[in-house]
Amino acid sequence: MRKYEKASKGEMTSAMKKIIEYMKGSVGIVAVALVLAALGAVLTIIGPDKVGEITDLMADGLMTGIDLKAVARVGIFLGAIYISSSLFTFIQQYIMATVTLKMSYRMRSDLSRKINCVPQKYFNSHSQGDILSRITNDVSTLQQGLTNSLPTIISAAAQFVGCLIMMFVTEWRLALISLFITFFGLFLIVFIMSKSQKFFLDRQESLGKLNGYVEEMYSGHEVVRISRGAENVKKHFGGLNEAVYNANLKSQFLSGIMQPLMNVIGNLAYVAVCVFGSMLALNGTITFGVIISFILYVRLFTSPLGQIAQGMTNMQTASASAQRIFDFIESEELSDESGKSSEMPEVKGNVSFENVRFSYPDTPDKVIIKNFSAEVKAGQKVAIVGPTGAGKTTMVNLLMRFFEINSGSISIDGTPISQLSRETVHNMFSMVLQDTWLFEGTVRENLVYNMEGISDESLERVCKACGLDKFVHTLPEGFDTVLSESVAISAGQKQLLTIARAMLQNAPMLILDEATSSVDTRTELLIQRAMDKLTKGRTSFVIAHRLSTIKNANLILVMRDGDVIESGNHETLMAKGGFYAELYNSQFDQAS
C-alpha cells in the first residue's frame, strides 16, 4: 500500500490541480460563487465606517441635538448592506453545494467504474476497507472541504485585503500598529500549516487501514470466535485505533492552536487600538467615531486570518483525500480489448494448456506455474488436486483471464483466450467459489442475479436438483423472502444457493472451487448428484481437497509446485501408487 505520509508539497499541489481539471465544466459557475463570496465580504467591510459615522453623528448631536434623519439614513443603508452581504453568501453557498454534490456524484461513479477496470493485482495489494474508504470517506471529505473551505478562504482573503485598505484610509498610524501585530500572527499560522500537512495525510491513511481491518474481522467474526482470537483482534484493533487517535490528535492539536492564537492576536490589536486611539483622540487628531470604526475593523481584520487558517486546515484534509482518490482513479487499468473478439461460435468446451508459465505481477521472480500443459476434451470433468500452494486456483484464474500468463497459451476450441475479450471468456463459464456471495435481497434475486427471463419452473427445477426445494418452501415468502440477518440460513444452504445460481446460468463450462467444502455429508451427496447431472455434457473444472468427491472425474490433474506431475482417472492414478495415491490414502488415514 502506498505510504501517503511521504507525500510532498508538489503532490498536494498536483492533487488540487487535478480537482480543478475534474471540475472544469463547472469552473464558470464556481468563479461566480467565489465572486459572490468576495462581494459579500467587501460589503461587510463598509459596515464599520458607517457605524463610526453614526457614532460621530450621535457625539456631535449631544450638545446641539442629534440629527435623527441622518442617523436613520445611515442605519437603513447599513441594514441594506448587511442584508445584501447575507444574500450573496447564501447564493454562493448554494452554488458551491450544488457543484460539489455533482462532483462527488461523478467521482463516485468514476470510482465505481474504475473498480471493474483495475487488474486483480490491485485488489491483492489493497484491503477492501481501504478501497471502500476512498469511495466513501475520502469523497465526502473532499466534497465538504470544497463546499465550505474554498469560499471561506476567498471571502476571508477579500475581507482581509478590504479591511487593510479601509484601515489605512481611516487612520494610517493605527493601521500600522494593527498590521504589525497581525503580521506576526500570520507568520505563525504559515509556519504551523507547513508542519501539519503530514499529520492530515496520516489521518486519512490510518483511517483507511482501520476500515480495512474492521471489514475483514467483521466478515470473519465466526472464525475469530471459534479460534478464540478475540484478544488478538482486540489488541491489533487497539493498535490501529491508537494510530487513528494519534494522527487525529496531532492534526487537531495543530489546527486547534490557530483559532486561540488568532484570538490572542486580535485582543492585542484591540488593546493597541484603544490605547493609541485614545491618545490620538485626546490630542484631537481623530474622533471617537474613528476609534469605534477601527475596533470593528480590527475584528474584521483578524477574524479572516482564523477563517483562512481553518479553511486551509480543511483544504489540507481535502487535498489528502483527493490524493488518495486520484491515486485509485489513475491506477493501472486492464489492457484495452477493443481489437479483441467479443463473439465466439457455439462453444464445445475443448480446452488446451500449452507450456503455461505464470508469476504474479508483484513477485515476478517467484514462478507459480512453471510449465503447465494439458488437453481437456469437450464434456470432460477435470479435477485439479494437489497440496496448498500447488497452483490449482491460480490455474483456474488464468483460465478465466483474471491474470495474464507470462508465456505459453490457453485455448478454448482452438482459439487462444488472449484473442478473446474477458467478458466473452467469462460468459463461457459458471463459477462456484469457496466463499459464498449472497447479497441482501430476495432468494429469487440472489438466484437470478444478472439473468433475465428465468421462470418459477426453472427456479423450482434447480432448487430440487440441489435439494433446496424444502428449505425454500419453509421460508415465509418462499422465493420472495428477503435474505437478511433475521433469516437463519446455514453455511451449507448458502453454498447450495450459489450452486443453484450456477445451474441457472447454464454456461457451456463450469468451475467448482471447493464447492462442497462447507456442507455436511448428506448435503454433499445431494450436491454431488446434482453436479453429476449439471456437468454431463459440459467441460467442468473441479478444485477440491476432499478427493472422495472427484472419483468420477474423467481426468485428474495432480499438481505440485506449479507443475502437473500426474494425470489420469482415479483408478489409473491409484494403481500407479504415486503422489495422488499418497494424497488420497493420507486423507482416509486422517479420517480414521
Q: How does the language model describe each region?
A:
Residues 96, 100, 114-161, 219:
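Juxtamembrane loop-to-helix connectors within ABC transporter transmembrane domains
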Residues 1-44, 59-74, 92-96, 100, ...:
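Membrane-integrated ABC transporters
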Residues 344-592:
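ABC-type nucleotide-binding domain
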Residues 60-62, 67, 166-180, 250-323, ...:
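Helix-loop-helix
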Residues 42, 81-100, 151-158, 179-205, ...:
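Alpha-helical transmembrane segments of multi-pass membrane proteins
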Residues 120-121, 137-146, 150, 154, ...:
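An intracellular "coupling" helix at the cytosolic face of ABC transporter transmembrane type-1 domains
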Residues 30-88, 168-173, 284-288:
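Transmembrane helix-loop-helix hairpins at lipid-water interfaces of multipass membrane proteins
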Residues 24, 35, 88, 136-181, ...:
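Hydrophobic alpha-helical transmembrane segments of ABC transporter permease domains
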